[in-house]
Amino acid sequence: MVRIATYASHSALQILKGAKDEGFGTIAFGKPRVKLLYTKYFPVADYFLEGDYPEDKLLELDAVVIPTGSFIAHLGVELVEKMRVPYFGNKEVLKWESDRSLERKWLEKAKLTLPRIYEDPDDIDRPVIVKPHGAKGGRGYFIAKSSKDFWEKAEKFLGIRSKEDLKNVQIQEYVVGVPIYPHYFYSKITGELELMSIDRRYESNVDAIGRIPSREQLDLDLDVTYTVVGNIPLVLRESLLMDVIEAGERVVKASEELMGGLWGPFCLEGVFTPDMEFVVFEISARIVAGTNLFINGSPYTWLKYDEPMSTGRRIAREIKIAIEEGKLEEVVT
């Protein structure tokens, strides 16, 4: 009997609740301290296994692991690629998502509008945002206005002192606009893309600085940071929905040519500019924490399903359909 398992963090509550709604047994695994969160306060886990990745026990319980950002961050891409436990999704996608140069190639292949990338900090001629590689919830991001500003902040925030240390960061043009994070689900079984929900992030300290009068901001000499602390639901202007949907379709098509396909949940992270252009910064090729806003469904999933449908439940339903049709091996790697 297949059970659905995930690392006890990030979006595990939503994933396991969705799995229960679809009739699956559930497993959370992770640090002992959080056991009661998943078994008592929010009783969504039938089993709680201690450890970052208790592989033998997961195999014994016939688990299918659902990846999250926390899971990838804790184990690392190399270990996840070697997992013996069935993994929902295409593991090949991981290296394309975690390496910003490969990610850029993917998004360019999808013909999305992207910000300029600066290979040399000395070429900075406008505001840029500097991003370390990997899924870290915005930690280590910073804004720089010039080459001099870049080097000062790179040493302060990331310990970078020379160009030889730049291989693990990306210097990206800062595009002004409204941040949006559309959440998608692509079904390998039906070949259909679904827009599940949309959010924007609440980040520390950038979203709190506006509460401080400008004069005091200058006196405090604050450094802006972008660590994600929460999420805010967003319903997009209806005339912009096709821009978002078409971007998702192109990303899936490009993935089929580059890495054998992307299926399951993913998110494009970008902004709508004042000219109503959707500029994409990066992709999260897995469930994102912004979907936690919609455990009982979103305005978009209600239009399609007429029942509560979270991204976590949609994952479980895909696995359920795959089992019923004898296609489970097609949706796990």
From Swiss-Prot:
Tell me the InterPro entries matching this sequence.
ATP-grasp, ATP_grasp_subdomain_1, IMP_biosynth_PurP, IMP_biosynth_PurP_C, IMP_biosynth_PurP_N, PreATP-grasp_dom_sf
GO BP: any one term: 'de novo' IMP biosynthetic process
For whether the record's keyword set contains Magnesium, the answer is yes
**Catalytic reaction(s) noted:** 5-amino-1-(5-phospho-beta-D-ribosyl)imidazole-4-carboxamide + formate + ATP = 5-formamido-1-(5-phospho-D-ribosyl)imidazole-4-carboxamide + ADP + phosphate
The ATP-grasp domain is annotated at 91-324
Q: In which pathway does it act?
A: Purine metabolism; IMP biosynthesis via de novo pathway; 5-formamido-1-(5-phospho-D-ribosyl)imidazole-4-carboxamide from 5-amino-1-(5-phospho-D-ribosyl)imidazole-4-carboxamide (formate route): step 1/1
Cofactor details (free text):
Binds 1 Mg(2+) or Mn(2+) ion per subunit.
Which GO terms fall under molecular function for this chain's record?
A: ATP binding; ligase activity, forming carbon-nitrogen bonds; magnesium ion binding
* Binding positions (5-amino-1-(5-phospho-beta-D-ribosyl)imidazole-4-carboxamide): H10, S70, N231
The enzyme's E.C. designation? 6.3.4.23
Q: What is this protein identified as?
A: 5-formaminoimidazole-4-carboxamide-1-(beta)-D-ribofuranosyl 5'-monophosphate synthetase
In the UniProt record, the gene name given for this protein reads purP
